[in-house]
Every structure is written in structure tokens, then in C-alpha cells.
Amino acid sequence: MKIMRKSHPLFKIVNHAFIDLPTPPNISGWWNFGSLLGMCLILQISTGLFLAMHYTSDTLTAFSSVAHICRDVNYGWLIRYMHANGASLFFICLYMHIGRGIYYGSYLYKETWNIGILLLFLSMATAFVGYVLPWGQMSFWRPTVITNLLSAIPYIGQDLVEWIWGGFSVDKATLSRFFAFHFILPFIITALATVHLLFLHETGSNNPLGIPSDCAKIPFHPYYSTKDFLGALLLIMFFMTLVLYFPDKLGDPDNYMPANPLNTPPHIKPEWYFLFAYAILRSIPNKLGGVVALVLSILVLAFLPYLHTSNQRSLMFRPLSQSLFWTLVADLLLLTWIGGQPVESPFIIIGQVASILYFTIILILMPLAGLIENKMMKW
């Protein structure tokens, strides 16, 4: 008699995806972040659902409804802080996942990589509209400033901004539609993540050496399911420490004041996980140029498969490309810091240099390093 997980139509899908999945025998802990992202997504959807039960998307009551959740709802404060800090955790895992993909050449699986870029854009959109919902000072001023950048688009810019706002300013219509977007987008992300997995399982996982491992693959369970469980346990420990001891560490104090259109905060900035893109946006004095640079800061990832010049897939044995990769990581950290600073000297020039370096490394230096390494290896 056949085992049910191998014969039942529904269990068979789960079996092929998570139990008997042929997996390279040498993948490291850097491959854990995919499953951790799945865990973060489940956490965000479940906590968000409970918050949506008590939240009201009206400009008059939104701020007080969040206060009501924290004060009067049983464990509401915990659900709220888990959801708020869960977004930070999600983006930490996301950036680690992308970094691993770049380092080990996983971007050569073009379909999987492009779906991943689309998932990144959708995740950023979800986080952006979600930050508006508490209707604090930063919740109001941030979308006002960021969405107003779309007015730089020729011909349709101003109409597009007013269409997004639902009026001539960020108001009740904006809050209602942003709440609707914030509710539906995670489910679209879940569907796309399934497609992402589907494409990945068509090709099989990459490995640190970047070489085919079809002849030596092992089943995912119990080897990697145990490893993923350990990763999840460590992440939960870090996450709960953050939520219970430092819940407001990654937030903005201005958001504890109700939204006031007549009082502008001294320094409007996005959440920490968008600061690198915000710094690139600010580094260009022209409004339209800044918007284009902002989009390209993420879209540039789509060029990576076409800029790969090395005969080796992974950076494991490519010291020149390795040094460029870690320079890129340092540059992104510098941009994140700059994005949180006021627009004044010397931060302006540092941001401009770091922005130029970001695009130069990805578009010019890394392909060049691949060619040099090929020459050094006499390939």
C-alpha cells in the first residue's frame, strides 16, 4: 500500500515541495532565509487580521482606535508591536535573502529572480501603505511627501497624485484606500511567493559552490527541515526580545502624536528599511531624476543576470568580486545612515558619492571584475 503523502493528490504537492524535495547536500545557513520569510509572512497576516478587527480607517478615529487596541484589547499591545516590528524582521530576512542570491549567483535562475524582485516591490508597497494607518504625524506627512514625488512624472503626474490621494490632499479617502491596499497586498504576495517556489522547484536550489549537484541530492526532510526549525527558533528569540524589551526602538517618536496637517515635523523620513532608497532619491537635485533613481535602485537587480560575465557562478572563489560585494554592503549601510540624516553638508555630498558608488559597483565594476577573474584563471 502506498504512503498517503505520496498518493493523496493534496498531500503529494506538499510532499514534493517540503518533504521529498531533492536538495543539494552542501547548502549553508544562508539558505534559511526563504523559510524565515514564509514564517514572517504568516506572522504579519495573522497579527494584521486581529488588528483589522479593531481598527477603523477614518481620520477622526484611526489614531484613537490604535490607542484602544493597545489599552483595551486583550494582548492588543503585543499584537500591535509584533506587527510593527514584524515588518522590520521581514525586511531584514528579505535583504539577507537577496544578498545571498547575489553572492552565490542565484540570480541566474531568471524566472525565480524576477518574481523575487516583484515580491520586493510589493513588500515595499505594503509596508508603505501600512505605515499610514496609525494616523500619527509621520503617518500623515510621509505619504504626503513621498506620493507627491509622482507629480514629477510629465503630463500625468499631478492627476496621478490626486487619483492616489482621492482628493487634493492626504485625507479620509487616502486612509480608506491605503487600508484596503494594505489588507489585500499580503495575499497577493502569498500567491506570488507560491509562484516563486514553483519556479525554484523547476530548477532546484543553487548551492554555495555554484555547480550542479543533481547526483548528490538529499531529501529536504529531515535534514533541512530541522535546520530551518533551528533558524526559526533563533529568529523568534531575537524577535520577542525586540518586541518585549525594545518595542519602539525601530519606530518614530513623532508617530505618537496625532496627525496634524498644520504642523510639519522637522525631519520627514521613511522607515529604516527604506532609507537607502530615500538617500539615493535625495542625492539627485532634480525631482524627476530622483524618482527615476529611486525606482532604479531596486530595478537594477533585474539587470544582474545579464551583467554576469564570470565563468564561475558563485563568488566563493572570486576574491576580487567578493571585495566588491562587501563594498556594496558597506555602501548600502552608509546610504541607510545618510537617509536618516538632515539634508545639509556634509551629508548631501556623502549621499551623492555613495549613490554613484552603488550603481557603479553593480553596473560596471562587478561585470568588469568577472572578466578580469576569467583572464586570471586563463578561461
From Swiss-Prot:
- The transmembrane segments are 33-53, 77-98, 113-133, 178-198, 226-246, 288-308, 320-340, 347-367
Task: List the InterPro entries hit by this protein, alphabetically.
Answer: Cyt_b/b6_C, Cyt_b/b6_C_sf, Cyt_b/b6_N, Cytb/b6-like_sf, Cytochrome_b, Cytochrome_b_C_euk/bac, Cytochrome_b_N_euk/bac, Di-haem_cyt_TM
The record's cofactor note says: Binds 2 heme b groups non-covalently.
GO MF term (any one): ubiquinol-cytochrome-c reductase activity
SUPFAM superfamilies, per the entry: a domain/subunit of cytochrome bc1 complex (Ubiquinol-cytochrome c reductase), Transmembrane di-heme cytochromes
Cofactor(s) this protein requires? heme b
**Membrane topology summary:** Multi-pass membrane protein
Positions contributing to a ubiquinone binding: H201
Would you say which domain of life the source belongs to?
Eukaryota
- List ligand-binding residues for heme b b566: H97, H196
- One biological process GO term for this chain? mitochondrial electron transport, ubiquinol to cytochrome c
Q: Can you tell me which family this protein belongs to?
A: Belongs to the cytochrome b family.
Supply the name of the protein.
Cytochrome b
